[in-house]
Amino acid sequence: MLHSQNLQNSASKPLVSFIITTCNTDARQLRACVESVLKLSLSHNDRELIVIDDGSREPAINVLLDFCDELIYVRQPNQRLSMARNRGISMAQGKYLQFVDGDDYLLQSTYEHCLDLVRYHQPDLVLFQLSTSPKVPLADDYEGPCTGVEYMQTHNLRGTACGYLFSKHLLHGLRFTTMRHYAEDEEFTAQLILQSKHLFSTSAKAYFYRQHATSALHQKQPKNKLLRLQDTEEVILA
């Protein structure tokens, strides 16, 4: 296990902990991901950047040496995404948490709106939109506050855990299920939303999602479709 030096003042907790997970991510994409966090209007003490390297063939820290003073790096044997995120949760000291996949990145201009909602309204959770294009319109709209139950009565669930900036106090021991192949996000985010008593949502597209033909959501083989349906059924009936 490798750790970079964490220079954060231990006397005060950061506002947001960003949990970046990576496994054999392209070097340029991983650096762009880290840089997108560092460009935000958060001081060094207001942010915590945790990179969980889930068994990459070559240590991801090798391409992040320029950022060692800005992040905490942990390398572990490959245990899949859920375990990597759970590791990040256990380490995070921030009041709020944000998951970022290592090949994606935050869209600065619109993510700032989400940070403003946190600063001025102290919500339990901010729900924002994802984009497959790096060019997005500015947005400063929002709805809320409402409870998670009220939100779910009028909206469909968006499973991806990267679409939420949420207060750590919502977790109450909640973690990602490690036995599922596909529906771990849906189970986690549904419970997270239902725990929320002070939820805000915005149309701001604040997260760039890189589509891959090999990703779980794009697997077309009957076996993979069946596994996803089985996992989804278990989540619904749980």
PLM feature spans:
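Nucleotide-sugar donor-binding/catalytic module of glycosyltransferases
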Residues: 1-230
